[in-house]
């Protein structure tokens, strides 16, 4: 591997030799064990003897030890030596984990996986594993492909971010000194490199300067932050004394976008105080280094650094760290981060001022409480650096201004106070400088112009700290680590086991003892450490000791994590308390905690610094701080400054700020997918290679490493979904994989077979509801089994292929053998005959015989005539078929007209139904008014309720007496009060969020109170009564609270008293709830009264607008009808004009059906076919040009021969022979051209038929568009009906409200009525939303139809061009015929007797051909007319589409109006809910009169019974009214039947998709193989193309050589020409013949050159053809993308149809109010859906073609996988929330049941305790009443939370169902993908065939080229012979008359010799 050459590879993975060496160690699983050792942790040993539970072991050191068996731990086999993932260990125990880490650390393999996280051990030295080459090794690799490394985890986070579209976080945790900071820097560098943005174009920069990129700036933040935030501690030389969360933002393509930093818990105290062995922050020592010697002078640092107290209290240098080099890096980082020189200098000046300020000294004035400066040198230097006056600075420190009353005075400070003020200012100043640095870095890293879609957060925060002296800072650092550890535990352990519970597998919940909630609550909960610290900060005269004593009193002995500190040992400081953290027990000292928490600052000093003139940075950092004087001035001016001191409130402690930032951090982490890096300290000595076993084991335990591995081993870490499992492992059990449609059952069958075969055991796996779970390593075992099975199958497959190839090779060899035998026989015969004289004579005579050649030519002409006759017969047949199809179209048109007529009748029926609905609505209004009258009769019953209140009040008085008797017993439970109070406070904290919501509702209530003021005047009398009831209720609530408190304390001691109390409290609670509910509902209805009246007017006005819109739509319908009549007339005209095109149409229909069946295989071949047609047309054009050139050449030759005929008969005979041969060649070329023309004509016919089919589809789309438009109109009318119905219902509601002013007893019935109205409103809103979606669907379809119309227009234009091209070809063919006719006539002059008959026959056939051509031309003309008509139809269709678009836009505007109405109703509903809540709170205060009714209990019972009877009677009346209104509901069943039919038709539409999805499950296993085959095929094609290119290159070279030879021959010809000219001068009589001969030779040479160029052009065209084949693949992929988009549109259309179906079901409920209308609408919907169904069936071919688009579907599959993962994560999170809500609701139920039981039990005891209760005093009664009120409020809060919990539970359930549905959809998409892959394989095969055909075509062209080359050589030889004959003729020109026969014989001999040579060469 290339990786192994990297120098860092040896520190990442062992070599094979090392692995073999480690695995060859001796091992016995029964004897080799680990035993505990106090020094090494564990030692290896071997068992020698066993006796009972004792074993004797010989250690590796040779010692013999006897131990108990339980202390011995198993040893893993050598196979797992130095394993990279410790979860793979067979024996998982502490000893094995420690040994694995120790052995890897000894080999400097510092990274090791531990289950799901990574463990890294600090190597304490530099390793070459973080170089750029190492980083590149891990980029884009899976985590399992590479060795453990920080980069592997980082790359996994990066890929998860891009694939899952989820933010990621990397939590690098561990103790201080473990290497967190270094790993953080490496992670940041890696992400900067991966998402590098340097290649992006940016602004022009100076070419002499290096461009600073964003990744450089991100990396350079580390030196700056480390200089100001890192310091040396006892355990770490570069310890981060602050926490940071670095968010690196990326766009959706993974490109680096920006970065920002958030920091936490900066240790400010370090700047003024350092512990022994530690150092202040690095920046101070860097400034004092010699990197910039002049800097110290500028900063006035003239003393040794050891003399500056603030930075020199301990260490000054660090071993191994060069401050000069570090300062250089810091200064350069400032420049890269765009810090200006002034900003840098100001920052350094502030650091220098800090050092100077630490050296300022003060002394106490004698006998005064006033401090004064003891020397001003350092103060002057500090003031100089600050840019302020020295005297002003010192005065502000020693005499700060404070406010006394209303005046500001100077307050004297003693030395201690001044020193405190100096330290506080130093800490505050440094903290603000650090904040400024972080903000400046964030500003620089905030890049503009790149989207920030996702981020990866890297958390580096101070590790857990246990020092000798632990103070306020250590408490917060340890608290943060505690929270992070709990986050890790919850993510790693709880969620894992909850996954098992959700899947329903057999699993016992394991408690791994890592719940850190107790420690966290001890710190942050009420009465916790932080809460008590904040409380002490506001208590006067509070000190650190009072805080410590309160903490001890509150928690010692009561909380398991709070302990008394042990006495200090060694250097340990004194401690006030100890706390047990997850990492150990820490001793804390409370010294200065109050001051650190309050963090006070000297406002006078701050004011002076804000006036600085020499340091702009100082002014900037204090700009947001408001001093007391400034706040007072703003208060006087009305500025509202108050007393804020630069904080977020009037008093914000440091703890509050820390807690807020920590909560934000945890919230952010919970929204990301975490990746954990656990850093381990190997030893305390910072020595490389040494492991401190006890220290490492403690960290492993605290970090949860061992528990993580254990749960990973005990659980099932590997899992896969049922469909995925079945698809991948179906090869192991093919029969079982297809046994059932349920994938879970298939998975169970597969696993059962594997268990029966012995491949697996039942303990290795579990089958859940949706997934199969595996133990660690089982999945790898299954993969091995699968690979073996695949190897077996592939071996058999390969053997079959080899057998088949062998047979083919044998057949080829046999055919080759037969051909060779024939060739050999012919060669032998020729060798025998060539010396035979008769054969020689035959060879000379045969070429002179013309009869045979003429017969062959006549036969060829006869064949052509027959072919033309056949083509005419086919044309006649096509014409007849087109006529038949035209008749069918006429019938279809008539049926469409009948449908339009039915639509008109339906419109009139709809108007009648509207009138009926209005009448029904009036009747309903009357019935509701009667109900209102009945409700008004119940007003008198309110008085009965008041009497019931008095009776309950008497019972409360009895309870008071019993309470006095219980006082003595309650005192005994006083010791339990504190714990109960703690619980109450915790509940109060939980209720704070509810209180905030209540506060918001109160604000809304105030707004509503202004509106309801008039109504409240009418209710003033009721409010007076309510006030009186409030007073009584307050007393009773206090009583109940006291009862609750007393019963809580008495619960353990006296159970009998608890039971009595529960009974009483339950009864009181029930009565109170009844009163509260009645009051709330009464007030709610009163408030709604006014609103409903105003809303009624607005709804009525909207109804009028909608009616106007209905009339407008009716007018549009009439216009559409007139347009339909016009279209009918046009269609009638079109029917007459299409009679001649019927034949082509039937052919096209048949081809369309065939194409519909084959579209899955051909995919996007249409575009490729168009390209092939274009290529063939180009080839045909070239052939035509060649033919024309050949004709011209031959005509020239014939002209020359005619001139020579009179002068030299022999020369003419020779030329005629040559012309005959050339003519034969041209005849062949012409025949080929004619065949190509016929093919093109056939293609033209096909394209014409396709065009006609497309026109038919366009007409169908127009019909569909009109149908959809009518459907949209009908839906608009429905929406109007719904709106009018809604208005009427609202008016009815207003009438009801006016009748219910004082009807409190009937609130429940009115509430139900209100809920019905709300549900109707929701139904109307949902219906409107569905209408909007349908309109959007219509608009999308219209756009699609318009796009298809444009495509049809383009195809029509192409067809017209093709027709014109064919016409040109026919004209050229006609011209060729005329030329041949003239030529034959000329040749007939030579032999008139022999050729006269043939000429007559040819003339007759030519006339017949001419007639056929005329007929074809007339047919083309008719087709052209048809095309023109179709073009007009297409334009009309486009106009209709535009009109439909306009209608759709109008519908969209209408929908927006409806949406606004719905939004108004939604707002009003929210207002009503707010009013209801406000009324509930008001009416709680009006129910206190309940307990005055002492003597009315029996009357109350009677009244309640009467109310119940009345309620029953009213319910019965409402039921009767509902039955009356529902008389129209009988048609619902008819609607359901219609809807079922519609659903069946939609199922037919989805049939093709379902088949593809079913086939996908069985074919998914072919995906990987298909991809491999595709890559192989591509590589083979590329190789073959490369070979062809080489062949073509060789051919070009050969052509070049041939060209050179031709040029040489041309030169020789030129020489010959010169010689002939000289001869011409000598032979003046023969000059004309010589010129003609020379011209002929020149033309022959030119022809040869032309032929050569033409052949070269053909070779180039062949090469272009091969390149075009390559481009075809790219075009096909683009077609895949386009088709996939269309598939997405169709899918959305499918989903919208499903939504429409659901809308139809919801419309059934609405049909109760409009039964008659629903029946007609259902009929209309049936007609519309049937038309849509027919349209969808016609589009099935297009849908099937879309299935072949693979590449985009692969992207969809990946996206589906990502959504599936995200959905699973969401489901997991929702399940967690669901569990929490369930637990909370169960807890509330238990509390409620307990309270009810207590009230029931205490009722029995109250009577007995009545007499004793009188002995108590008024104070106890008041206390108990107060307690009753508190408990009642808590009870109300618990009820609200219980209701909220139920709501959240329902929402979570819905979310889980939605996610499950999404997962199912993703599965279906994946199944559909497999079908597409198979189709792509078929397409690849066709492309292979096309490539082979191209190769064959190239070979044929090469052969043709060779033949033409031979012919050219023959022509040159004949030219030579012609020149010889001419020379002979010139020599004998003056001879006697007998010379002519001599010339003739010599010419004949030449003619005989030339063909002989030609034939010999051809033979």
Swiss-Prot record:
Binding residue positions for ATP: 174-181
A Pfam cross-reference name: Myosin_N
Actin-binding: region residues: 662-684, 766-780
Region Hinge: start-end pairs: 1162-1173
PTM characteristics: Unfolded unc-54 is poly-ubiquitinated by ufd-2.
Major localization listed first in the record, in broad terms: cytoplasm
Domain remark from Swiss-Prot or TrEMBL: The rodlike tail sequence is highly repetitive, showing cycles of a 28-residue repeat pattern composed of 4 heptapeptides, characteristic for alpha-helical coiled coils. Limited proteolysis of myosin heavy chain produces 1 light meromyosin (LMM) and 1 heavy meromyosin (HMM). HMM can be further cleaved into 2 globular subfragments (S1) and 1 rod-shaped subfragment (S2).
Job of this protein: Required for muscle contraction.
Identification of the protein by name: Myosin-4
Lineage, highest ranks first: Eukaryota, Metazoa, Ecdysozoa, Nematoda, Chromadorea
Gene field: unc-54
């Amino acid at each position: 591997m290339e990786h192994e050459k990297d120098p860092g590879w040896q520190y990442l993975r062992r070599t094979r030799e090392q692995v073999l060496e480690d695995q060859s160690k001796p091992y016995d699983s029964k004897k080799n064990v680990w035993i505990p050792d106090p020094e090494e942790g564990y030692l290896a040993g071997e068992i020698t003897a066993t006796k009972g539970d004792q074993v004797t072991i010989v250690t590796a050191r040779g010692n013999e030890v006897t131990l108990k068996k339980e202390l011995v731990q198993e040893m893993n086999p050598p196979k797992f030596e130095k394993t990279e993932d410790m979860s793979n260990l067979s024996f998982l125990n502490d000893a094995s984990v420690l040994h694995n880490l120790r052995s890897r650390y000894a080999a400097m393999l510092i990274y090791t996986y531990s289950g799901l996280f990574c463990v890294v051990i600090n190597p304490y030295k530099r390793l070459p594993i973080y170089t750029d080459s190492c980083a590149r090794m891990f980029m884009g690799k899976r985590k399992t492909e590479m060795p453990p490394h920080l980069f592997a985890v980082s790359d996994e986070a990066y890929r998860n971010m891009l694939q899952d579209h989820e933010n990621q976080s990397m939590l690098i945790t561990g103790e201080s000194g473990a290497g967190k900071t270094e790993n953080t820097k490496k992670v940041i560098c890696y992400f900067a490199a991966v998402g590098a943005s340097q290649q992006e174009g940016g602004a022009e920069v100076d070419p002499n300067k290096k461009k600073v990129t964003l990744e450089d700036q991100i990396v350079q933040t580390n030196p700056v932050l480390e200089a100001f935030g890192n310091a040396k501690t006892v355990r770490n030389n570069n310890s981060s004394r602050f926490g940071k969360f670095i968010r690196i933002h990326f766009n959706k393509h993974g490109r680096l976008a920006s970065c920002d930093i958030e920091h936490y818990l900066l240790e400010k105290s370090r700047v003024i105080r350092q512990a022994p062995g530690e150092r202040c922050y690095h920046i101070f020592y860097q400034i004092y280094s010699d990197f910039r010697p002049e800097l110290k002078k500028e900063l006035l640092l003239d003393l040794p650094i050891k003399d500056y107290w603030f930075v020199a209290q301990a260490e000054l240098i660090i071993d191994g760290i060069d401050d000069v080099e570090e300062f250089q890096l810091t200064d350069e980082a400032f420049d890269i981060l765009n810090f200006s020189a002034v900003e840098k200098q100001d920052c350094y000046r502030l650091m220098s001022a800090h050092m100077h300020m630490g050296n300022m000294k003060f002394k106490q004035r004698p006998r005064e409480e006033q401090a004064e400066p003891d020397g001003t040198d350092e103060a002057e230097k500090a003031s100089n650096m600050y840019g302020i006056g020295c005297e002003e600075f010192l005065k502000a420190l020693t005499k700060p201004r404070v406010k006394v009353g209303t005046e500001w005075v100077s307050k004297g400070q003693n030395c201690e106070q001044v020193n405190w003020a100096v330290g506080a200012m130093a800490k505050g100043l440094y903290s603000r400088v650090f904040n400024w640095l972080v903000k400046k870095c964030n500003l620089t890293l905030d890049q503009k112009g790149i989207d920030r879609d996702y981020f990866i957060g890297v958390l580096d925060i101070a590790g857990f700290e246990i020092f000798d002296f632990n103070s306020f800072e250590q408490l917060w650092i340890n608290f943060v680590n505690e929270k992070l550890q709990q986050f890790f535990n919850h993510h790693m352990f709880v969620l894992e086991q909850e996954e098992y519970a959700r899947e329903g597998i057999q699993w016992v919940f394991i408690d791994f003892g890592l719940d850190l909630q107790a420690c966290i609550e001890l710190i942050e909960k009420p009465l916790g450490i932080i809460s008590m610290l904040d409380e002490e900060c506001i208590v006067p005269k509070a000190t650190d000791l009072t805080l410590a004593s309160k903490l001890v009193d509150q928690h010692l002995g009561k909380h398991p994590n709070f302990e008394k500190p042990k006495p200090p040992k060694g250097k340990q400081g004194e401690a006030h308390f100890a706390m047990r953290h997850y990492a150990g027990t820490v001793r804390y000292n409370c010294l200065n905690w109050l001051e650190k928490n309050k963090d006070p600052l000297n406002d006078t000093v701050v004011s002076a610094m804000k006036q600085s003139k020499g340091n702009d940075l100082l002014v900037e950092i204090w700009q947001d701080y408001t001093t007391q004087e400034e706040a007072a001035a703003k208060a006087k001016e009305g500025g509202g400054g108050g007393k804020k001191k630069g904080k977020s409130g009037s008093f914000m402690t440091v703890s509050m700020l820390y807690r807020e930032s920590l909560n934000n951090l945890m919230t952010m982490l919970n929204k990301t997918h975490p990746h954990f890096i656990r850093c381990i300290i190997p030893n305390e000595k910072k020595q490389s290679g040494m492991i401190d076993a006890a220290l490492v084991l403690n960290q492993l335990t605290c970090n949860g490493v061992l528990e993580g591995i254990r749960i990973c081993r005990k659980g099932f870490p590997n899992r896969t979904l049922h469909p995925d499992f079945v698809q991948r492992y179906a090869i192991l059990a093919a029969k079982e994989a297809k046994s059932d449609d349920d994938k879970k059952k298939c998975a169970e069958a597969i696993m059962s077979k594997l268990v029966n075969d012995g491949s697996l055991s039942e303990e290795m796996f579990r089958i859940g509801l949706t997934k199969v779970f595996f133990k660690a390593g089982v999945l790898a075992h299954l993969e091995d089994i699968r690979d073996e099975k695949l190897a077996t199958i592939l071996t058999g497959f390969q053997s079959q292929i080899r057998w088949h190839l062998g047979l083919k090779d044998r057949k080829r060899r046999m055919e080759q053998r037969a051909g060779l035998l024939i060739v050999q026989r012919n060669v032998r015969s020729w060798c025998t005959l060539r010396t035979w004289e008769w054969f020689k004579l035959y060879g000379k005579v045969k070429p002179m015989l013309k009869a045979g050649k003429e017969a062959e030519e006549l036969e060829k002409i006869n064949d052509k005539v027959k072919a033309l006759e056949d083509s005419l017969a086919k044309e006649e047949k096509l014409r007849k078929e087109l006529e038949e199809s035209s008749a069918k179209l006429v019938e279809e048109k008539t049926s469409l007209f009948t449908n339009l007529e039915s639509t008109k009748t339906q419109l009139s029926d709809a108007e009648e139904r509207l009138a009926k609905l209005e009448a029904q609505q009036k009747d309903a209004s009357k019935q509701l008014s009667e109900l209102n009258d009945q409700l008004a009769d119940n007003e008198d019953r309110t008085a009965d309720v008041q009497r019931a209140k008095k009776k309950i009040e008497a019972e409360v008085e009895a309870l008071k007496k019993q309470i006095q008797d219980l006082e003595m017993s309650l005192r005994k439970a006083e010791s339990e009060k504190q714990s109960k109070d703690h619980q109450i406070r915790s509940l109060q904290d939980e209720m704070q969020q509810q209180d905030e919501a209540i506060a918001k509702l109160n604000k809304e209530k105030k707004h509503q109170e202004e509106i309801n003021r008039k109504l409240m005047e009418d209710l003033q009398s009721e409010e007076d009564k309510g006030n009186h009831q409030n007073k009584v209720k307050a007393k009773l609530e206090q009583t109940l609270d006291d009862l609750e408190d007393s019963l809580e304390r008495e619960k353990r001691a006296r159970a009998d008293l608890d039971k009595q109390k529960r009974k009483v409290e339950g009864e009181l609670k029930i009565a109170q709830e009844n009163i509260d509910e009645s009051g709330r509902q009464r007030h709610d209805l009163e408030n709604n009264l006014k609103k409903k009246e105003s809303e009624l007017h607005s709804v009525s006005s909207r109804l009028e607008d909608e009616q106007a819109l209905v009339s407008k739509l009716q007018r549009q319908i009439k216009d559409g009808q007139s347009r339909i009549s016009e279209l009918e007339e046009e269609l009638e005209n079109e029917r007459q004009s299409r009679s001649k095109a019927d034949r082509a149409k039937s052919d096209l229909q048949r081809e369309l059906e065939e194409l519909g069946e084959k579209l899955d295989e051909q995919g996007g071949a249409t575009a490729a076919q168009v390209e092939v047609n274009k290529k063939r047309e180009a080839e045909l054009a070239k052939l035509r040009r060649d033919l024309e050139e050949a004709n011209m050449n031959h005509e020239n030759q014939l002209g020359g021969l005619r001139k020579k005929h009179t002068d030299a008969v022999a020369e003419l005979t020779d030329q005629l022979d040559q012309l005959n041969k050339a003519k034969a060649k041209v005849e062949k070329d012409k025949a080929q051209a004619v065949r190509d023309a016929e093919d093109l004509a056939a293609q033209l016919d096909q394209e014409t038929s396709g065009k006609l089919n497309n026109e038919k589809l366009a007409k169908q789309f127009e019909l569909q568009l009109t149908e959809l438009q009518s459907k949209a109109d009908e839906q608009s009318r429905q929406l109007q009906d719904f709106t009018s119905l809604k208005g009427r219902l609202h008016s009815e509601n207003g009438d009801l409200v006016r009748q219910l002013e004082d009807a409190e007893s009937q609130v429940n019935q009115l509430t139900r009525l209100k809920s019905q109205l709300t549900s109707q409103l929701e139904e109307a809103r949902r219906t409107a939303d569905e209408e909007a979606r349908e309109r959007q669907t219509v608009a999308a379809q219209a756009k699609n139809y318009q796009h298809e119309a444009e495509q049809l227009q383009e195809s029509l234009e192409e067809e017209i061009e093709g027709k014109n091209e064919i016409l040109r070809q026919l004209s050229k063919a006609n011209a060729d015929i005329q030329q041949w006719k003239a030529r034959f006539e000329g040749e007939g002059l030579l032999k008139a007797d022999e050729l006269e008959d043939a000429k007559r026959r040819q003339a007759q056939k030519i006339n017949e051909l001419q007639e056929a051509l005329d007929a074809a031309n007339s047919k083309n003309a008719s087709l052209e007319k048809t095309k023109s008509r179709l073009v007009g139809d297409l334009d009309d269709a486009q106009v209709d589409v535009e009109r439909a678009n306009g209608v759709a836009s109008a519908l969209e505007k209408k929908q927006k109006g409806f949406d606004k109405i719905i939004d108004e109703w939604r707002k009003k509903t929210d207002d009503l809910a707010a009013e209801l809540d406000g009324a509930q709170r008001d009416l709680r205060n009006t129910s206190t009169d309940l307990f005055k009714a002492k003597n009315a209990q029996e009357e109350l019972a009677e009244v309640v019974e009467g109310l119940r009877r009345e309620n029953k009677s009213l319910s019965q009346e409402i039921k009767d009214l509902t039955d009356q209104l529902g008389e129209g509901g009988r048609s619902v069943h008819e609607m359901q039947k219609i809807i079922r039919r519609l659903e069946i038709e939609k199922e037919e539409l989805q049939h093709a998709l379902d088949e593809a999805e079913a086939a996908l499950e069985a074919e998914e296993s072919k995906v990987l193989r298909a991809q491999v085959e595709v890559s192989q095929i591509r590589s083979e094609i590329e190789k073959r193309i490369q070979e062809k290119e080489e062949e073509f290159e060789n051919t070009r070279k050969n052509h070049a050589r041939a060209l050179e030879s031709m040029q040489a021959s041309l030169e020789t010809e030129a020489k010959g020409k010169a010689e002939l000219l000289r001869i011409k001068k000598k032979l003046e009589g023969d000059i004309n013949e010589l010129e003609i001969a020379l011209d002929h030779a020149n033309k022959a040479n030119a022809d040869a050159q032309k032929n050569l160029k033409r052949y070269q052009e053909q070779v180039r065209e062949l090469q272009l053809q091969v390149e075009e084949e390559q481009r075809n693949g790219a075009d096909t992929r683009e077609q895949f993308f386009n088709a996939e988009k269309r598939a997405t549109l169709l899918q959305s259309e499918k989903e919208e149809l499903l939504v429409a179906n659901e809308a139809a079901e919801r419309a059934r409920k609405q049909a109760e109010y409009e039964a008659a209308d629903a029946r007609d609408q259902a009929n209309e919907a049936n007609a519309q859906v049937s038309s849509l169904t027919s349209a969808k069936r016609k589009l099935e071919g297009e849908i099937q073609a879309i299935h072949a688009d693979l590449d985009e579907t692969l992207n969809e599959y990946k996206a589906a996988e990502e959504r599936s993962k995200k959905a699973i994560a969401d489901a997991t999170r929702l399940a967690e929330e669901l569990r929490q809500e369930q637990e909370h609701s169960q807890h509330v139920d238990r509390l409620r049941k307990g309270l009810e039981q207590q009230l029931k039990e205490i009722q029995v005891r109250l009577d007995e305790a009545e007499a004793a209760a009188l002995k108590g005093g008024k104070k106890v009664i008041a206390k108990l009443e107060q307690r009753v009120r508190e408990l009642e409020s808590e009870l109300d809060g618990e009820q609200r939370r219980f209701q909220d919990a139920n709501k959240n539970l329902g929402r979570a359930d819905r979310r889980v169902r939605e996610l499950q549905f999404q997962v199912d959809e993703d599965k279906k998409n994946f199944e559909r993908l497999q079908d597409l892959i198979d189709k792509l394989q078929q397409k690849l095969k066709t492309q292979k065939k096309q490539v082979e055909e191209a190769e064959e075509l190239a070979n044929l062209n090469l052969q043709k080229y060779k033949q033409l080359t031979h012919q050219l050589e023959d022509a040159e030889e004949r030219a030579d012979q012609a020149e010889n004959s001419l020379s002979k003729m010139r020599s004998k020109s003056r001879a006697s008359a007998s010379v002519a026969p001599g010339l003739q014989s010599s010419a004949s001999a030449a003619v005989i010799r030339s063909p002989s040579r030609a034939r010999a060469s051809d033979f």
